[in-house]
Amino acid sequence: MVPLLIHLPPTSEDVNSSNRDERDLTEEVLSQAQVMYNIISSTATKGFKSKVYGQRHISFEIVAHGGLVHYYAVVPLVLVDVIRQAVAAAYPSARLEEVSDTNIFSKVGKMSGTIGGEFTLKKSFVYPISTYQESKRDASRALLNALSSASREDGIGVQFLLRPAYDGWSKASESHIDGMKKNKGKKKGFGGVAPMDIMEALWKPPENNEKDGGSSSEDKQLTSLEQAEVDAISEKARYPAYEVLVRVVISSNTAARSQVLLKNI
């Protein structure tokens, strides 16, 4: 793996914000990131080895060390040129420099002052996470504010480990949507029969099949909330997908200080 330090330009060099609507600026920033991720997704390979071991992964990292915040891309040697092209295509003013590994671990705190963890999804991966437009706030700014609380003796690393998702990931989303539509109105109990249906059958006269068939389409109408969920899943399936692991590691002089920094993140 090759560590690449990303030198970021002032925001005005890549995005001219003078006399422009904020929504247009947001769309431009998102489109730049989309260009980069589309190029990275093209590195996916096919074959037996890819199915067994998965795709090659890369890592984007935000590191706070020595009172400064740095951005890194750590990539396999064979993908260095591709990542350089992807970043240059999306952010022409950015520059990548090959550097040596950075050691963020405190010599004073050692193992006792080091703490870390990883983020996990609460629901299935078919559900989208809150995007930049939906959250109505700049998550990266909140993260930078947390990193800025680190002193020169502290070390913080936030790692986004990603690789292109397997080919059939979108089929899982389609199956989930189909299941929502088919199971609408079928909240059954034991044996596929609702308990209330059993009680009603004791005194309710039988109904013909035509009436049942006519009401089935009405039962399967999704509510506005369910339809919004379907739309969100379908929207996610339109874009290239990645398997992502987000990890955080913090090292400080004391365990208590590391805990405080972790809670800030």
Q: Where are the predicted features?
A:
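Extended, folded cores of ATP/NTP-driven motor/assembly subunits in large transport
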Residues: M1-I265
